[in-house]
Amino acid sequence: MSQHFPCYSAVFPLLLRERNGKREVLLHRRHNTGYMDGKWDIAGSGHVDEGETARQALARECSEELGICVRPEDAEFAHVCHRLGKEGDRTYYDLYFFVHAYEGTPAIMEPDKCDGLNWFALDALPEDMIDFRRLHLHQVLNGEVYDELF
């Protein structure tokens, strides 16, 4: 008989803007987290906590990590990746959402976990971005709604 395993969920708010004729995405650089430190990642991402929906988690994470207010109804589902854990890593459902509106100016609110915050043109993403986040971002922008990594 197969054994059920714990499966975690994480949310990824896609904050996009137009600047100088280029579309940009907001990324943060991970620091002192124990996971992919020094790599650029989707800004405001985080775990879904017990008892909250994915959109509620996204609003909470944006407030905690970026200091901005996102209403859950301003987050539009875009993509999910079922990411199977390897060698003891956790299995995740990564949920990506377009954020259509927010209040405030994004800032680093958790300097113990993040040491960089910047807008990057979609055609000039940093080389040291987490590889599979780059892949997912391109999939989202191409209208792909589901992926699996194993």
Where are these regions (language model features)?
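Short, well-ordered beta-strand micro-motif
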Residues: 15-17, 29, 96-100, 118-121
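Conserved N-terminal beta-strand and adjoining loop/helix that marks the start
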Residues: 1-26, 98
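Acidic/histidine-enriched, glycine/proline-rich intrinsically disordered or flexible terminal extensions
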Residues: 144-150
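NUDIX/MutT-family hydrolases
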Residues: 107-140
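Conserved Nudix-box catalytic region and its N-terminal flanking loop in Nudix hydrolases
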Residues: 22-64
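Short connector loops at helix/strand junctions that flank enzyme active sites
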Residues: 8, 37-43, 72, 90-94
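A short coil-to-beta-strand element that immediately follows conserved catalytic motifs
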Residues: 69-79
